[in-house]
Amino acid sequence: MFFRRPSCLERRSHFTRKRACSMKLSFQTAGPDGARTLLVKTSVSPDAYQDLTQRLLSVQELQAQQVAFLTPPQGDGVVRLETAAGALSGDLLRQAGLAFAVSRGIRREKKFPVEAQSVPAPLLVHANPLTGQVTVDLPPPQAQGTRSLFGQQASVLHFPGLSYVICQGSALPPDPELRTLLSQLAQEWEIPGAGVLFWNPQEDFMRSAVYLPKTDTLLQPPCCSTAAAAMAAWHARRQEGLHKRTIRQPGGTLQTTVAIQGGSLRRLSVGGPVTLGPAYEIAF
């Protein structure tokens, strides 16, 4: 399927039919308006991820915030998720899982392993193509600590490929301040992504942002799976048993489950609705 307005898109992104085409790129849109992801299904070299990501994000009609590449698995997964940034993303894992299920004609609830470049083992995704509900089991934090930020002593959770600072407050700082701070933290921790979440305990409401240094991108997702998982893990710390929690964010709610056994986090999952859009093909 081609873009509905190919001449407009080709003109603005310099992808013209008169130009000799070196490749055709197939992708599917996922996520809500304002936080759209492009799931690229064409096999491309990882060396091209950075350039293709920048070019696709520059197409204004797509209104995309992220680009992910769905590739053949390298291990025991059914599909592999890779990005130019290389950071852990619960949202992208859930979107990739549903896209895989739909592409295989799966019409019932099913669990399957999805690989990601930031973790050594596949992560279990539970998808229901009929309802669009998708849950992913994320890896537990590898380490935790504290940090003095924004005039408070904040907790820090280090996941594989991504770290989150957990603060209390009702609003995120201005973008320039966020970018500077998170860029410094990503460099200090030598990680693909550094994030911060602000939790308002009175309203039980959360906002988050993440900076990806490899693509120099600051994201403020309306409903972030990984941030919700970090919030749930922090709330359940040192409390034995099974903890279920609804995490409210500007873009909606996500359901989290944390299992603590013997003082260790044994399971961390986050789920909610995923929206898949049309599939497109672009030539350039």
What are these regions (language model features)?
Residues C8-S22:
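Short, Lys/Arg-enriched N-terminal segments with co-localized hydrophobic residues
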Residues C21-S89, R94-C223, A228-F284:
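Active-site proximal loop and beta-alpha junction motif in alpha/beta enzyme cores
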